[in-house]
Structure formats: structure tokens, C-alpha cells
């Protein structure tokens, strides 16, 4: 699968005018496969950054590198993934992303210092694998639109946070599979 990941990124860069030639790259990681920390997106972005550096003189933006990753997931692997994981890996840090125009998402950094709040990010290997969740991932955009509709909007970006919070009980009642 990793070889295919590299081939499809190369194809995307060829389509953007890259004159690719041989290249030796060695990568090591101890991130468990399927651990849910976007390791696939990080690998896709790594390949994009390497190709961009070596063959495109860094002309491809971090946003475009993320979009290449999404395109490859959709086209070559048949995974209806969005752009969030690739964008977070490519742009880096904590960001907000507005997908009002999917071809040109608005990306803004969020300034936060977890240590000042006495917090730390810990990653644990739960042993769970999310590799077979394609249908669940594909359902997320429709579920978000359903929540927005309950809150009086078409998409969640149009719903003020206060309205969203105020409508949580209605969302749970109308949209939950299990009513409590």
C-alpha cells in the first residue's frame, strides 16, 4: 500500500509539471498502523513534501500537497476521506479550516499553549484498528448537514456556536440512533 501511495503522489506531481527522476528515501516510524493519529495522512504529506522539494522547487503549497493526498485517497484507494487529516499534517500546528470553497479552503492558525493550561497531549496505542471504517467516514458530511438543519442552517459553519449548543438536546433527540 505504501508503494501505491508513493506512485499516486508521483502521478499527481507529474500532472503539475514535475520531471521526476530516481530518488532514495528512507523512513522510520514507530506509530502503530491504524492507531487513529492520521499516520497515513502524515506519510502522504511527507511524500508530497519530498517531491515538492526535490522536483518542484517548493512551488506546491502545503494546501495543495494536502489536496493531492486527499485526491489520491479518493481516486486510488476509493476512500471518501475529507481533507482535514492531510491539511493538519501539511500545514502543521493547530489550525481552523473553513471548507466553504473546497478548492481553496481558508486555513488559520490557532495560538494555544497546552502547557500554560497545565495540559499535555498523550498518545496511547489502544490496539484498535479503524481501517474498516470507510462507510462511517463517508457518513460524516451528511451527519453534519443533518445537525446543521436541526440548528436552522445548511452547513455547520453557518450555525453560531451558541445556537449549536442550545440545539444539542434537539439534535440528540432527532438524530440519535439510540434515544435516551
What are these model-predicted stretches?
Residues 5, 179-180:
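Short, intrinsically disordered or compositionally biased N-terminal tails of bacterial proteins
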Amino acid at each position: 500500500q505504501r508503494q501505491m501511495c508513493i506512485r499516486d503522489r508521483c502521478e499527481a506531481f507529474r500532472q503539475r509539471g514535475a520531471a521526476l527522476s530516481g530518488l532514495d528515501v528512507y523512513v522510520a516510524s514507530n506509530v502503530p498502523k491504524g492507531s487513529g493519529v492520521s499516520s497515513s495522512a502524515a506519510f502522504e504529506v511527507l511524500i508530497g513534501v519530498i517531491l515538492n522539494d526535490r522536483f518542484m522547487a517548493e512551488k506546491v503549497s502545503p494546501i495543495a500537497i494536502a489536496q493531492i493526498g486527499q485526491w489520491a485517497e479518493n481516486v486510488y484507494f476509493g476512500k471518501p476521506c475529507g481533507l482535514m487529516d492531510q491539511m493538519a499534517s501539511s500545514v502543521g500546528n493547530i489550525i481552523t479550516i473553513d471548507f466553504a470553497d473546497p478548492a481553496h479552503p481558508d486555513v488559520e492558525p490557532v495560538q494555544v499553549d497546552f502547557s500554560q493550561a497545565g495540559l499535555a497531549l498523550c498518545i496511547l496505542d489502544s490496539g484498535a484498528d479503524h481501517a474498516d471504517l470507510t462507510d462511517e467516514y463517508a457518513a460524516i458530511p451528511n451527519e453534519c448537514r443533518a445537525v446543521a438543519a436541526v440548528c436552522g442552517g445548511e452547513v455547520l459553519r453557518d450555525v453560531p456556536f451558541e445556537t449549536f449548543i442550545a440545539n444539542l438536546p434537539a439534535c440528540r433527540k432527532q438524530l440519535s440512533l439510540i434515544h435516551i
